[in-house]
Amino acid sequence: AVFDKILANPVIANVMDGAAFGRENGCDFVIGLGGGSSIDAAKAIAMMIPNEGNYWDYIYGGTGGGQRMKNKPLPIVAIPTTAGTGTELDAWTIITNEETNEKMSGGNKNTFPVLAVVDPNFMLSVPPKFTAYQGFDALFHSTESYINKTNNLMRDMIALKAIECVG
């Protein structure tokens, strides 16, 4: 079954619709195919298929409910078709709550993708303009990591190398 209703910046409604679709179709894992938004949404959907309530109930910052999930998320497979966010390598999602105008991060140790299929050939069809946007995204993420107040030597080394590669 294919759920293809993810927005460029996913919102709670995307997540909840995707979770309902997953439940209706008896999904036992979730594949995120596309850019960072698609993969972030897949992680959030994987969280919500086996759990009740609203996605925002499980967000710890802002107006989130701060609840613990009762059930582990479904396994997630990430297949990026763009480069820039690196979301296939982490457990975190970025989802927008349109009611409160908040864009918050969610996830936990169980929302790391169990598999990432990273093939540069998937990125060949991306228009040059979007490839440039993704380069800036990678640069900003790396710079953010480097100047973060909770940084450490290993993170600094990786961030500096990423900045060097992108620059």
Question: Language model features by range: what are they?
Answer:
Residues I6, T82, N121:
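Anionic group-transfer/hydrolysis microenvironments
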Residues W92-G167:
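Carboxylate- and glycine-rich phosphate/diphosphate-binding segment that chelates Mg2+/Mn2+
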Residues A13-A20, E24-V118:
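Glycine/threonine-rich beta-strand-loop-alpha-helix active-site module
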Residues V2-I12:
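Short beta->alpha junction loops
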